[in-house]
């Protein structure tokens, strides 16, 4: 979802019932009107689909998350990217594809269509659904996705600015589902399952750590049986012995946690 995260939008409007999934959402120009009429709101159509780009030179094909944007929209922040998308049709690809050997001028046929496009350049675009992102002009995306019968269709309305209450009213009037950017992450293929898996892993790690700490505390207490007996013989109260044991364990846990966090930070760095 890094590609969606880096786009300078705040909300997305989808077709009702699409569950934030671009491939299940189809909107038309009339969905833009209620948002465009709100002061301080920038609204622009966004097309998104997954395509296979076949190399015209017989090289390796590319699996892309293809985003169609209007060249003069707020989604395109770089002047050179605006100029590229406003010119003859072409692809602006994620920079990691350049590291894999893709070069400016390479030509690809997209999505089983007859649309062949040259690579115009590269930008940091990230990924969506584990596929590197490629940008094309919106009308080019519509031609790839729908052929000659695009009829102004796109996937979602990208929004920036405005008051939440006013946007909710506009969304109800337009008959669309309005989501924040973070809510839209759930529509990325595999995102919910992967998030759930990571949550389960974290839960298991916490449970295992609690069991390990408990086992260590038990072993430490057993090893101190004679010492505890001596303290009792010397008149130590049960409260003192409990505080002493728990204090030692807390100190050990704190030191071990600090070492673990420091080690993890070094690995991440």
Specify the residue positions occupied by each region the protein language model found.
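Hydrophobic, regular-secondary-structure patches
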Residues: 1-63
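Membrane interfacial helix motifs at helix-loop boundaries and amphipathic/re-entrant anchors
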Residues: 2-7, 18-21, 182-201, 262-269
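Peri-transmembrane interface segments
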Residues: 172-213, 218-226, 230-231, 242, ...
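Alpha-helical membrane-embedding segments
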Residues: 38-45, 179, 257, 261-268
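Basic-flanked hydrophobic alpha-helices used for secretion and membrane insertion
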Residues: 50-55, 62-189
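Transmembrane alpha-helical interface segments in multi-pass membrane proteins
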Residues: 230-269
């Amino acid at each position: 979802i890094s590609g969606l995260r880096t786009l300078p939008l705040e909300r997305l409007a989808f077709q009702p019932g699409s569950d934030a999934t671009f491939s299940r959402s189809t909107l038309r120009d009339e969905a833009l009107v209620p948002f465009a009429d709100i002061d301080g709101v920038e609204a622009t159509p966004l097309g998104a689909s997954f395509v296979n780009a076949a190399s015209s030179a017989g090289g390796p094909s590319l699996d892309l998350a293809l985003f169609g944007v209007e060249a003069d929209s707020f989604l395109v922040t770089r002047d050179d990217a605006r100029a590229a998308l406003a010119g003859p049709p072409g692809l602006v690809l994620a920079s990691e594809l350049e590291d894999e050997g893709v070069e400016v001028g390479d030509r690809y046929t997209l999505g089983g269509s007859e649309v062949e496009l040259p690579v115009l350049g590269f930008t940091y675009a990230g990924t969506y659904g584990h596929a590197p992102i490629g940008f094309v002009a919106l009308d080019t995306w519509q031609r790839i996705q729908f052929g000659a019968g695009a009829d102004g269709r796109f996937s979602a309305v990208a929004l920036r600015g405005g008051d939440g209450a006013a946007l909710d009213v506009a969304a109800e009037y337009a008959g669309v589902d309005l989501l924040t950017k973070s809510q839209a992450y759930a529509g990325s293929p595999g995102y919910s399952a992967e998030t759930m898996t990571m949550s389960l892993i974290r839960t298991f790690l916490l449970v295992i750590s609690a069991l390990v700490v408990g086992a260590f505390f038990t072993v430490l207490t057993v090893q101190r049986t004679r010492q505890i007996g001596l303290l009792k013989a010397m008149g130590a109260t049960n409260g003192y012995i409990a505080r002493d044991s728990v204090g030692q364990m807390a100190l050990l846990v704190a030191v071990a946690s600090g070492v673990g966090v420091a080690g993890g930070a070094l690995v991440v760095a």
